[in-house]
Amino acid sequence: MVRKRRSVGARTDRDTWVRVERRPLDRITDQGWNGTESAALLKGVAQPVWQGCVVWRDADEPVMWRADETGLLPGEPIGTAVLGEEPALSEEWWRAFGDSLDALARNTTRRVATPDTVTITQDLVSESIRGVFPEVIDTTVERWVPAHADLNWANMSAPGFSLFDWEDWGNGPRGLDAATLWAASLAVPVLADRVRSERRDDFGSRDGKLMTLFVCAKILGPGAHPEDPRIGAARQMAEQVVAGLRTG
């Protein structure tokens, strides 16, 4: 059995996987609550095969329950969401990772990404960045593309690459996934550098720079943990990005 922040999952006696999530009604948006199901239609993305689901409303509390059944992973989850040491990942793994993220961005959807179950909008991006980096005036996102929106090391497998837990996916600013994974890697500098290298086109775009500040704001903002080992690296990168945006 695997327990995560919002769900619990376990292997079944027919060699499939069932993931059960409990979500408050006020956290279910107008687009519904079928991320894993709708992600099954994505082309070119390595993910477990979706089999079916059951959804029900709690009789006693204002919450919904959802159980999704999928195929098994071609490996094990790489680790916790934020890693403290470098994982052993092959070059084949990194190629599959890059191919899947490229393919994901080529798909189309009407869904909107909900990182941390919060719908991402232009206003959210602007408020998040300016709340920590007020010197950044223009926070306009130019390109919105499909994103996993919870891309971290607990949601990918190895040695075989697969991307799972799709409940938050939808359109988001270009670079959202790359920046999210980079932030989850900052405690291991060599890993964070590899993520930036693999997704350099995303990070080099203006939207990618804004997403770098978006994730840095979460690490450096008022609610940040003072002992977070990522603070120093996030602050250093944020200073570089802010300077770059100000000079054009």
Question: For each of these PLM feature ranges, what is it?
Answer:
Residues 5-11:
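Conserved ATP phosphate-binding architecture of protein kinases
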Residues 14-69, 76, 81-103:
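A conserved alpha-helical element in kinase catalytic cores
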Residues 90-97, 103-149:
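An alpha-helical support segment within catalytic cores of ATP-dependent transferases
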Residues 145-155, 160, 165:
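Conserved catalytic-loop position in the HRD/HxD motif
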Residues 158-198:
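Active-site Asp-x-Gly
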Residues 182-248:
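A conserved long alpha-helix in the C-terminal portion of kinase-like catalytic domains
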